[in-house]
Swiss-Prot record:
Belongs to the prokaryotic pantothenate kinase family. ATP binds at G100, S101, V102, A103, V104, G105, K106, S107. InterPro entries: P-loop_NTPase (IPR027417), PanK (IPR004566), PRK/URK (IPR006083). Keywords: ATP-binding, Coenzyme A biosynthesis, Cytoplasm, Kinase, Nucleotide-binding, Transferase. NCBIfam families: panK_bact. Gene3D superfamilies: P-loop containing nucleotide triphosphate hydrolases. It is an enzyme of class 2 (transferase). This is Pantothenate kinase. Its main location: cytoplasm. One of its GO terms (biological process) is coenzyme A biosynthetic process.
Amino acid sequence: MPGTLDHFRADEYSPYHFFSSEEWAKFRADTPLTLSADEVKRLRSLDDPIDLDEVRRIYLSLSRLLSSHVEASQLLFEQRNRFLNMGDVNKTPFVIGIAGSVAVGKSTTARILKELLARWPSSPKVDLITTDGFLYPNEVLRRENLMERKGFPESYDIGALLRFLSAIKAGQPNVKAPRYSHLTYDVLPNEFTVIDQPDILIFEGINVLQSRDLPAGGRIVPIVSDFFDFSIYIDADEDFIHNWYVNRFMNLRQTAFRDPNSFFNRYASISEEAALSIAEGLWQNINLKNLRQNIVPTRPRADLILRKGENHLIDTVALRKL
């Protein structure tokens, strides 16, 4: 099927090493489990069944791998400083990009990794930013007739996003990232998260691995992933993601949508049949199109692919060869 991990041939000439979840779990070695069941429950998103067993199977090995990349980056930084005779300068943050479809579990992965990586001695300060804050405000999207394209590449203020990442990788202190409200479904005016020289910055969003056409005139323009030191893609079959998205929408009708301030409050009081029809329409007309056109094509650019089965748990890991 197009859009599945089988697109990559698991042979000696594949750009990836492939591991089952059981094989991957062995790379944990003696990495201690530092999260409790209550912490995992707090960190996971609605309808995401991740538990301590999944953290043991997948995320401890992943945090160990990422920590070794961070330590290697720090060692290279020190060696380069000696080579350049630069003296005492601060290392810029190690940036991890996390991409994948809506409802696939990017946010849970990002939050779990943030907690685990912050407990490694090489990276005590870990921050997390999502691309949601870099969406254009709804007022702009309506004016440009882009509300039905929200989440597509053109709905983001790419200039602001690139300026943010450029400042982070330049080592600037107190870099501001705009904040987003999932309640109001809009960017919060004049509200920011301040990122102050962390050891690691996790940058999560559906299209963070997207490339772009070369501009006319040959002018060099960076892309978001140019600023990443490591990238992760969360993968699953279309049918699974479809079911997760619709189930999440229906469950939100009983929770967040009931808030009078919710952008989606109108869906809380309609019939279940009508709500299901709306969820299916949103999936078919917006999210599935974005997945096929803009998200899945970025998957081969990831350093690591975490592939989920129908139960929302990871069953295969693909790690790019060095």
